[in-house]
């Protein structure tokens, strides 16, 4: 086990310190720069694809296993200046690619809620650290459900804010038009407190919403809400216990005085293939920077040319799932398949427009189309089933790796549309609330009620 003044490394042989779930990659303590802020007295763990100037930033990959960032991500400085203490960096699927926290160079994460089952991914370590009561809250990233799915499996709250609300500067990109910093906590109160601290414009992030846009975002202020239930989410693959928890949450919502109505968002059916076309294409581009020459893992083998060294470094440094997605992305971007990418962007635009038209509030960046099915929020399950056991997951993945991709079918639509969504634990099963672009506070408001 290698030690530094600031961190303790957990090597891939399974050595752990104070962490029986392997939820951490490095264990460190960074005191806040302000001890009297709104988050004073809290501790947090951050996903290890977010840069910190203390310790390592690995993205759970061999190719970055020795990388030390010279700077903090914007969100790290915000949390520190508002009173929260950083106590560790969490395990994840390598570069955020996975739905079980199985694809990590530092070994898999187990689920504190049920250690026979997968914790979900890619922010499995972040969810496990909260479920295991190791910290007050944790920070993850959500590209296609990577905060909400593990929150559902680990029986905690997982919030993906509106795309652009929270700065991505210092986040190692997987798919930059989808990556969103998310918050995991045991209750909505701590998530809201953290969100209020991080919901700031950052001029270092070109995708961060400017102040003039933030001020124009309409807010919903009403006691009786209308909740939409898209029939496209009523899948035959939904397990009986997921259906039961969904029905229970809808029933409780009605008892609170809110209205529930069926709606239709037809483009949802095309969301999953569109997502994997776009995400892998962006990943192939983003990960092309890792060659092991300037920084990161280097095999130090004697080879005939620099190109051969780069190929060796990347082949040895990336895990199998990351290599698969790079290949898929490069194929999508090739001249023979460019039409697939263009069609995926069109589907995304259609989905954004259709989501926007369904909400009572207007979309600050789009001209809404008219719809007769106006609602304030949407409710749906986070996953089609409860967390599978490790044996079930490994067996299904060995038969067909696409099985793990299907886990994102209920979370991907909100990611493509860039809208806020939260997974709420209802009888041990995650139920998802989604709102209009920018209407994050309303999503958190109803999540706190149910």
UniProtKB/Swiss-Prot annotation:
Annotated EC: 6.3.5.7
Cellular compartment(s): Mitochondrion
The GO terms describing molecular function are: ATP binding; glutaminyl-tRNA synthase (glutamine-hydrolyzing) activity
Q: Where is the active site?
A: 47, 122, 146
Mitochondrion as a keyword of this entry, yes or no, is yes
Entry's Pfam families? Amidase (PF01425)
Gene Ontology biological process:
endoplasmic reticulum organization; glutaminyl-tRNAGln biosynthesis via transamidation; mitochondrial translation
| InterPro entries for this protein | Amidase, Amidase_CS, Amidase_dom, AS_sf, GatA
Q: Which Gene3D superfamilies match?
A: Amidase signature (AS) domain
Question: Mainly resides where?
Answer: mitochondrion
Q: How does it assemble?
A: Subunit of the heterotrimeric GatFAB amidotransferase (AdT) complex, composed of A, B and F subunits.
The family assignment reads: Belongs to the amidase family. GatA subfamily.
Name assigned to this protein: Glutamyl-tRNA(Gln) amidotransferase subunit A, mitochondrial
Source organism lineage? Eukaryota, Fungi, Dikarya, Ascomycota, Saccharomycotina
